[in-house]
A protein has these predicted regions:
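Short alpha-helical segments and helix-capping/turn motifs at coil-helix boundaries
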Residues: 30-34, 91-96
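Acidic, low-complexity, intrinsically disordered interaction modules
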Residues: 43-95
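Generic amphipathic, hydrophobic interface segment in small proteins and small subunits
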Residues: 34-45
Length: 96
């Protein structure tokens, strides 16, 4: 199953960010955790992310948008170890 199929099958809501000039989507906290689990189980690293906020029924970019987190693969790190570490860092960032 692809990530797109996983998102569709699990009825995960995507919030387009085109109005901010960003060619991507956002996910709520609960769905982001599900996606991280899928990535870990399917050996897909998570390269990083940014935090957005929902206020007055709108997605709001924080003043320091773009100052999120990222996870680069270390030299000699196996793909499996990198995936585990990147998914763990993503969970930690989202749960903060």
């Amino acid at each position: 199953m692809t990530i797109e199929e996983f998102i569709r099958t699990n009825h995960i809501c995507q919030y387009p960010l085109h109005s901010f000039g960003i060619n991507s989507v956002a996910y709520n906290h609960e769905d982001a955790i599900k996606i991280i689990g899928y990535a870990r189980d399917n050996v897909i690293p998570i390269l990083g992310g940014d935090w957005l906020y929902y206020k007055n029924n709108k997605i709001v970019l924080p003043i320091d948008y773009g100052d999120g987190w990222y996870c680069e693969r270390k030299e000699n790190e196996s793909l499996k170890d990198y995936v585990y570490r990147s998914c763990s860092e993503a969970e930690r960032a989202i749960r903060r």
